[in-house]
Amino acid sequence: MQENQQITKKEQYSLNKLQKRLRRNVGEAIADFNMIEEGDRIMVCLSGGKDSYTMLEILRNLQQSAPINFSLVAVNLDQKQPGFPEHVLPEYLEKLGVEYKIVEENTYGIVKEKIPEGKTTCSLCSRLRRGILYRTATELGTTKIALGHHRDDILQTLFLNMFYGGKMKGMPPKLMSDDGKHIVIRPLAYCREKDIQRFADAKAFPIIPCNLCGSQPNLQRQVIADMLRDWDKRYPGRIETMFSAMQNVVPSHLCDTNLFDFKGITHGSEVVNGGDLAFDREEIPLQPAGWQPEEDENQLDELRLNVVEVK
């Protein structure tokens, strides 16, 4: 009995560390990109998945100790997918005492009508959803729209654009919406998906699966996600290094003439970012940049099968 209590204490300790890490990651992202300001009214887009639940929970937690005042309103888009449990989110949000709005739009029917059987629905579904959320943000008078994309999503987007789009383009932590009226933020930009998954398991969020994109096999994004997970297992630290690279871009050592004036280089020009290392081997650090081994990583893996709620 005493041994079981000790194990529980260790689990609770590790999970508390996990929650603090997520808080720290979100807090750093908010500060680095000035995501939240005094008086902001933030529309938290809640899909019913682990990412958006975690985002809402961490933002609520930070709200209690933040040096500025801001408010949250959770918004869910009921797309009228067959079997969608309409009661889950209202019951959850009312229990928390969170202001919320459920928007009902039959985008599922539109997507099924427009997209041939067997084709991926993500592109059209995303466009429809985005337009509805922008409209809702205006109706609610919100100043920011918060989305639940995390670090792994950002890296996946970078590789998708490189592999299929011929662009080095990721998913920005903060941007102006394509209609030019709303500021979109991604507070989980620095958070690892595996941390979010463990946190969601511990909190036992009432997860609602997506019957559209979640049920489509062989999606390009899923292939990229599997590749990154494989790299993370085989080469610890590689994911952290790649994300660090997105924050440390050197335009003079790429090939985009829009970002750097290559034509303007003449005799007498200044040496930029160390010049050319074409004749020398560049020194690469033995430990991947941005990576630190976790002393309790193995323990956290074990907790996937036996988690307790983080208070």
From Swiss-Prot:
Assembly and oligomerization: Homodimer.
Family annotation (CDD domains): TtcA-like (cd24138)
Identification of the protein by name: tRNA-cytidine(32) 2-sulfurtransferase
Pfam families, sorted: ATP_bind_3
Organism domain of life: Bacteria
Catalytic activity: cytidine(32) in tRNA + S-sulfanyl-L-cysteinyl-[cysteine desulfurase] + AH2 + ATP = 2-thiocytidine(32) in tRNA + L-cysteinyl-[cysteine desulfurase] + A + AMP + diphosphate + H(+)
Family: Belongs to the TtcA family.
PANTHER family reported in the protein's UniProt record: AMINOTRAN_5 DOMAIN-CONTAINING PROTEIN, SULFURTRANSFERASE-RELATED
Family matches, as InterPro entries: Rossmann-like_a/b/a_fold, TilS/TtcA_N, tRNA_Cyd_32_2_STrfase, tRNA_thiolation_TtcA_Ctu1
